[in-house]
Amino acid sequence: MIRGILLLLLGTTRFSPIQCISNDVYFKMFSQQAPPEDPCYNKAHEPRACIPDFVNAAYDAPVVASSTCGSSGAQRYCEYQDHERSCHTCDMTDPLRSFPARSLTDLNNSNNVTCWRSEPVTGSGDNVTLTLSLGKKFELTYVILQLCPHAPRPDSMVIYKSTDHGLSWQPFQFFSSQCRRLFGRPARQSTGRHNEHEARCSDVTRPLVSRIAFSTLEGRPSSRDLDSSPVLQDWVTATDIRVVFHRLQRPDPQALLSLEAGGATDLASGKYSVPLANGPAGNNIEANLGGDVATSGSGLHYAISDFSVGGRCKCNGHASKCSTDASGQLNCECSHNTAGRDCERCKPFHFDRPWARATAKEANECKECNCNKHARQCRFNMEIFRLSQGVSGGVCQNCRHSTTGRNCHQCKEGFYRDATKPLTHRKVCKACDCHPIGSSGKICNSTSGQCPCKDGVTGLTCNRCARGYQQSRSHIAPCIKQPPRMINMLDTQNTAPEPDEPESSPGSGGDRNGAAGMAAQSQYYRTEGGRECGKCRVSTKRLNLNKFCKRDYAIMAKVIGRDTSSEAVSREVQRRAMDPDVADYEMDQVQPGSARSPITGVYEFQAADYPNPNPNPRGSEMERFDLQIQAVFKRSRPGESSGAGNVYGMPNTTLKRGPMTWIIPTKDLECRCPRIRVNRSYLILGRDSEAPPGYLGIGPHSIVIEWKEDWYRRMKRFQRRARTCA
C-alpha cells in the first residue's frame, strides 16, 4: 500500500519542483545579483545627501527610573475607573507582580500590555523621573508616552533633552493644566523665527486621551526647510531624553472615599475590590486634601506602558545607515570622506574644504588635500580658503622628500627643482651641493640650482674660477684677478694664423695689429723665472672648414698625466729626429721611473706666437704629456705629403684611439701658451711637421681648445665636407 502511494506521488507532475519552475526563473535564483545602489551616490557616482531610515530610537534602549513600584518590597498600588478603585500588590522579586522600567521600551503589543509603575506618591512635591539614553545623537520628530489602562494622568510634567549624553539638560516641552502658574509660560504661545528653538507649554487635561505626545517641529516656521536652519537642526538633536513628573491629576473624590469604607479583598491575587461610597464624607476627604494630588494611603502612582521616540540617526546627510560596532556603540557608516560617530568631521587628509552638512542642493563632500604625494597630514585654513574664492583651503603638514609649501610644491632651502621629474616624484628636489669655499651661501636658486658664487667664481655649484681669474689659497677670496698680461692670453678659441691669409685681413688669424685686438708679434714680457715670452696669439674668429683642411690631423684627447723629466724627453726627441723609425715603446723605456704631477688651471689657452719660425728647434727642452686619444676626426694617409717645411720628413700615420705622447717646448708651457690641465679633454688640430713621428707637438699652426660637446657635431660635419678641401 505504501509503495503504491509513493508511485502515485512520483507520477503526479505537480509535485515535481523542477517542472514547476521554468528554466529562466530557476537559473536566475543562482545568478550573481548586482550590488544595491549606495543612497549617498547617484548612478554617475556623484555624491548626494543621504539619511538613515526613520526608527523608534527608544526601542530596546535603557531607561532609568527614579522610582519603581515594589523595588523596596511589596507595595500596594491602586487603579481608578469611573467611580471605582481597584488596588493590587507589586513586588520586584515576583516576575508576575513586577513593573520594571525596561517595559517602557520593549515591543509594544496592545494584546499584551506591559507597564512601568512608580511607587505610590505621598504628596504633591514628589518628582519622579524617567531617563532614556539613545546611545548617540538622533534628530527627533516626536516623543510619545502611552499611559497604562486605568492609570491616573499626570497633571504637570516636563520633557528635557540632552545633547552631551546627560552632562547638561534643557527643556524640550512643558505639560500642565496651569502653565503660567507653574512654569511661567502661556498655554498657547505664538512661535516665530526668533523663538522657534524654545520650549512651549501645553495642556494635558484633555479627557479620553490615553497618551501624551510632543512633536518637535510642529508650529515652528523653519520646519519646512530644515536643511537651511542650523537653529532647528540643533533643536531636534538629542542623545538622551528625560521625563520629570511633577504631580498627578486629582482622581474622583468618591473613589478616594471608598478607601475608608472598606470592601472585599482577594489577598491571594493582591487585588482589592472597593465599592463606591456616597455621602458627605467624600466632600470632607476632598476638603482635607486641600487640592493635593494624593495622600499616603491613596495608592496613586505614575504608570506608563510605552515610551516612544521617533527620529533618525543623526549623520548630517553623509550616511544612509547606522550600525553597532564591536564595543556595542552605535555609529554612522559615513560616506563623502567624512568621519566621526555623527559624520561630523572630515576624515584625515581630507581638509581641502571646510566640513559642512549635506543638503538637497549640495552634498558638501570632503576633499583630499593636494600635497603632491609628499605629505600624509594637512589642516584647513579658512583665510586661504576665502582668498581662493572657496576652491581650496588645505595646508599640507610635515612635507617629505625635501619639499615645502602649502601643497609641498616647492623645494626647501638647500634644494632645487629637478625639471626632468614630475612634481609628484619622490626625488624631484635635488641638493644644491654648493661648494663650501667657492659659494657665498648654501641656498641655491630653487629653479635653476645656481649657487651664489663669490667674486671671480663660476659654475653651477661655484666650483671653479671664472675667466680672467686664477685660484688662490684664500678661503675668503678663492679666485683672484689675473695680471693684465695674462688676461690678453685668454680666448674661447685657440686659433693660430694661416700662412696664406692676408695680414691685413680684419678679424682674421693673421691680423696682428687689427681691430680684433691682436697682440703685436714684437711685444714680449719676462716671467718670474726670467724667461722672455711673446704674447699668445689671440683670435676671435671661429674655427672653420678652412682651418680644418689646412691641418694634417684633428683629434679629441684627454690629458691623463705629465712627465717632468724634460732632459730625457729632449734627448729622445733628438734621437727620433735623427732616426724616425724608432718605435714608440722605446720612449717609455727611457723614462721607467717618471713621475706625474697634476697641472692646475682654469682657462683655455692658445699656442704661442713663436718669434722663431722653427717651432721645435732641435736641442730645445721639451715637456712630455700622456694623452688618451678619444676620437680621431682627421689624420694623414700613408704617402701623403706632410706639407712644406716638415723637418722630420714623413707624415704621422700612427694616430688612432688610445695612448699617445704629446711634447710641448718648456718655454711655451712657462709662457702658458697653451696652458694645459690634467684630466681635461682638448680638441687638438696641427701639422705632422711640428713633431717627430709617433708624437704630437705644438707649433705656430697648432690649435688647442678645451673640449666642449658642441665640437663633436662640428668635427663630424667637417669630416663629411673634407673632400672639398683644396
Curated annotation (Swiss-Prot):
Laminin N-terminal domain segment(s): 46-312
Residues carrying covalently attached carbohydrate according to the record: 108, 112, 127, 445, 652, 679
Coiled-coil region(s): none
GO cellular component: axonal growth cone; basement membrane; cytosol; extracellular matrix; extracellular region
Tissue specificity remark: At the midline of developing CNS at the time of commissure formation and in different subsets of neurons, muscles, and epidermal patches.
Signal peptide: 1-29
UniProtKB keywords: Developmental protein, Differentiation, Disulfide bond, Extracellular matrix, Glycoprotein, Laminin EGF-like domain, Neurogenesis, Repeat, Secreted, Signal
Occurrences of domain NTR (ranges): 533-725
Gene3D superfamilies: 2.40.50.120, Galactose-binding domain-like, Laminin
Subcellular location: Secreted, Extracellular space, Extracellular matrix
Record-linked SUPFAM superfamilies: EGF/Laminin, TIMP-like
Sequence ranges assigned to domain Laminin EGF-like in this UniProt record: 313-368, 369-431, 432-481
Keyword Membrane: no
GO biological process: animal organ morphogenesis; axon guidance; compound eye development; dendrite development; dendrite guidance; glial cell migration; motor neuron axon guidance; regulation of photoreceptor cell axon guidance
Cystine pairings recorded for this chain: 313-322, 315-332, 334-343, 346-366, 369-378, 371-396, 399-408, 411-429, 432-444, 434-451, 453-462, 465-479, 533-671, 549-725
Region ranges (Disordered): 490-516
Keyword Secreted included in the entry's annotation: yes
Protein task: Netrins control guidance of CNS commissural axons at the midline and peripheral motor axons to their target muscles.
Protein name: Netrin-A
